[in-house]
Amino acid sequence: MSCTRMIQVLDPRPLTSSVMPVDVAMRLCLAHSPPVKSFLGPYDEFQRRHFVNKLKPLKSCLNIKHKAKSQNDWKCSHNQAKKRVVFADSKGLSLTAIHVFSDLPEEPAWDLQFDLLDLNDISSALKHHEEKNLILDFPQPSTDYLSFRSHFQKNFVCLENCSLQERTVTGTVKVKNVSFEKKVQIRITFDSWKNYTDVDCVYMKNVYGGTDSDTFSFAIDLPPVIPTEQKIEFCISYHANGQVFWDNNDGQNYRIVHVQWKPDGVQTQMAPQDCAFHQTSPKTELESTIFGSPRLASGLFPEWQSWGRMENLASYR
């Protein structure tokens, strides 16, 4: 391309007859951008066709959706308060609470005096009630079968068992079958044998017994008031074939005694000086049971048998 053609492209105005290279340089410097752009136009089109598609940016694989909050959520988020832990001392308060208790006023001495008098009355009433308690002063005869059988064969009559429930004495008597006509009575006293009463026993049909013996039962109501100084004793009489056989517990009789409470809560027989009578013969010391003594066990639980002598037990018939 000649200098003249170059100047015509850059500036379409008419040229002089002679064009020098300096004129071309001046025209290039002073020319406007549109002619240059038109001159470089083919190169821009070539670049767009070959490079733009190759350098196209990749699409992101992350699909992020921006969901606008609803108006209600926006209100709740502003109204909801954040939870915080605040200590009392940071608010100027004390970490401890102090309660002051004043001493109770002392009760006057006269109140205590009346309380002691009331306690004395209660103790007296309790003692009076205790003196009315009664227990059997003998073990159940049938618990020692060998002794019971020997006594029965010798005397023809023997107390089999006895119980004391409230104010009633009940029990059974075993007699030897020596005749068809029989009469069995309980002779009992409540005033140390100054007076006594004979109570008839009732025949009981033998279900498991043999033909050599019969069984009778009795029930005796005790008086409502029995002085502690009086003896309560009974024995058994058996009338058959014009003869009278007795069971008086080997001369000691069967006794019912008054009891008192010990500090450990156990009932025991009242001392002789308290009951105003003494015993004519010494008592044999008996084995102790979990209830304190065999006599006590018979009084508290008369329907229970004591098995303190297992070596003497045998089948009863």
UniProtKB/Swiss-Prot annotation:
PROSITE patterns: CBM21
Renumbered ranges of motif PP1-binding motif: 84-87
Gene Ontology cellular component list: cytosol; protein phosphatase type 1 complex
Domain CBM21, chain residue ranges per copy: 149-257
GO biological process: glycogen biosynthetic process; glycogen metabolic process; regulation of glycogen biosynthetic process
Gene Ontology MF terms in the entry: glycogen binding; molecular adaptor activity; protein phosphatase 1 binding; protein phosphatase binding; protein serine/threonine phosphatase activity
Ubl conjugation as UniProt keyword: yes
Pfam families registered for this protein in UniProt: CBM_21
UniProt-reported outcome of changing F87A: No effect on interaction with EPM2A
Membrane-crossing segments per the record: none
Effect listed in the UniProt record for changing V85A: No effect on interaction with EPM2A
InterPro entries: CBM21_dom, CBM21_dom_sf, Pase-1_reg-su_3B/C/D_met, PP1_3C, PP1_regulatory_subunit_3
Keyword tags: Carbohydrate metabolism, Glycogen metabolism, Ubl conjugation
Record PTM: Ubiquitinated by NHLRC1/malin in a EPM2A/laforin-dependent manner.
UniProt region (Interaction with EPM2A), positions on chain: 141-263
Variant or mutagenesis effect after changing D250A: No interaction with EPM2A
Stated role: Acts as a glycogen-targeting subunit for PP1 and regulates its activity. Activates glycogen synthase, reduces glycogen phosphorylase activity and limits glycogen breakdown. Dramatically increases basal and insulin-stimulated glycogen synthesis upon overexpression in a variety of cell types.
Comment on protein domains: The N-terminal region is required for binding to PP1, the central region is required for binding to glycogen and the C-terminal region is required for binding to glycogen phosphorylase, glycogen synthase and phosphorylase kinase.
Assembly notes: Interacts with PPP1CC catalytic subunit of PP1 and associates with glycogen. Forms complexes with glycogen phosphorylase, glycogen synthase and phosphorylase kinase which is necessary for its regulation of PP1 activity. Also interacts with EPM2A/laforin.
Stated name of the protein: Protein phosphatase 1 regulatory subunit 3C
Annotated organism of origin: Homo sapiens
Organism phylogeny: Eukaryota, Metazoa, Chordata, Craniata, Vertebrata
